[in-house]
Amino acid sequence: MTHDNKLQVEAIKRGTVIDHIPAQIGFKLLSLFKLTETDQRITIGLNLPSGEMGRKDLIKIENTFLSEDQVDQLALYAPQATVNRIDNYEVVGKSRPSLPERIDNVLVCPNSNCISHAEPVSSSFTVRKRANDIALKCKYCEKEFSHNVVLAN
């Protein structure tokens, strides 16, 4: 790295880096996945330059590691994301999200008549890949929605 190339977001000693998040999605991920419910330091880079994507978001969470299920649930929002496991400032593991069969406790059913809005139950959706889309079926009302409809909710 030359003196002209600087890290735009400070390195972390130990934790998780979620890189290659589409621009404007970083805050949504923080909220949906409750990543801010920690006392650990979180660094967010928004609209950073990216050779591949043009612009990207980035999230770094110190002393916190995502489970495989959490990584896979990112696939709906950031299918090209890379999740890096950091230890002693070095990348010790890399993973990419793959579409899970089910997503629990993250999304909200867009059907206003769904029982999940009135009862204290955790959301649960079955994930199905379609030709040009991803379908999400609510466990409670059994209605199927395009993932874009659920994500916009």
UniProtKB/Swiss-Prot annotation:
Its cofactor is Zn(2+). Pfam families: PyrI, PyrI_C. Keywords: Metal-binding, Pyrimidine biosynthesis, Zinc. It comes from the Bacteria. GO terms for biological process: 'de novo' pyrimidine nucleobase biosynthetic process; pyrimidine nucleotide biosynthetic process. InterPro entries: Asp_carbamoyltransf_reg_N, Asp_carbamoylTrfase_reg, Asp_carbamoyltrfase_reg_C, Asp_carbatrfase_reg_C_sf, Asp_carbatrfase_reg_N_sf. Gene3D superfamilies: Aspartate carbamoyltransferase regulatory subunit, C-terminal domain, Aspartate carbamoyltransferase regulatory subunit, N-terminal domain. One of its GO terms (molecular function) is metal ion binding. Binds 1 zinc ion per subunit. Signal peptide: none annotated. Zn(2+) binds at residues 109, 114, 138, 141. One of its GO terms (cellular component) is aspartate carbamoyltransferase complex. Belongs to the PyrI family. Contains catalytic and regulatory chains. Involved in allosteric regulation of aspartate carbamoyltransferase. This is Aspartate carbamoyltransferase regulatory chain. It comes from Escherichia coli O7:K1 (strain IAI39 / ExPEC). The lineage of its organism: Bacteria, Pseudomonadati, Pseudomonadota, Gammaproteobacteria, Enterobacterales.
